[in-house]
From Swiss-Prot:
It holds the Pfam family Multi_Drug_Res. The chain crosses the membrane at residues 3-20, 30-47, 57-75, 86-103. Keywords: Cell membrane, Membrane, Plasmid, Transmembrane, Transmembrane helix, Transport. It comes from the Bacteria. This is Quaternary ammonium compound-resistance protein QacC. Its main location: membrane. Belongs to the drug/metabolite transporter (DMT) superfamily. Small multidrug resistance (SMR) (TC 2.A.7.1) family. Changing C42S: Confers sensitivity to ethidium bromide, but does not affect resistance to quaternary ammonium compounds. The gene is qacC. It is found in: Cell membrane. PANTHER family: MULTIDRUG TRANSPORTER EMRE, SMR FAMILY PROTON-DEPENDENT DRUG EFFLUX TRANSPORTER SUGE. It comes from Staphylococcus aureus.
Length: 107
């Protein structure tokens, strides 16, 4: 169950980040509200995850996969450009997250 919580936390963090970009500095009501609600749900499920998994694994997985998925959203939805350094960095983040989950300590 903790990994289900983590998936929900990551998903809502990515959704919240997209809403945050769309809110244009909290100047648009609906995207601003979406940001607040999404991050509220995100942190609730992140805290539920931390009841079962170590902080280092939880946070690294949440932050790393959140960054990767947010980058994908930024490319697809917001038409942002990336370069080779960005791609290499994302691959390194994925390797780090996978390594922590395979070799990291558990409760």
């Amino acid at each position: 169950m903790p990994y289900i919580y983590l998936i929900i936390a990551i998903s809502t963090e990515v959704i919240g980040s997209a809403f945050l970009k769309s809110s244009e500095g909290f100047s648009k009501f609906i995207p601003s509200l979406g940001t607040i609600i999404s991050f509220g749900i995100c942190f609730y499920f992140l805290s539920k995850t931390m009841q079962h998994l170590p902080l280092n694994i939880t946070y690294a997985t949440w932050a790393g996969l959140g960054l990767v998925l947010t980058t994908v959203v930024s490319i697809i939805i917001f038409k942002e450009q990336i370069n080779l350094i960005t791609i290499v960095s994302i691959v390194l983040i994925i390797v780090g997250v996978v390594s922590l989950n395979i070799f990291g300590t558990s409760h």
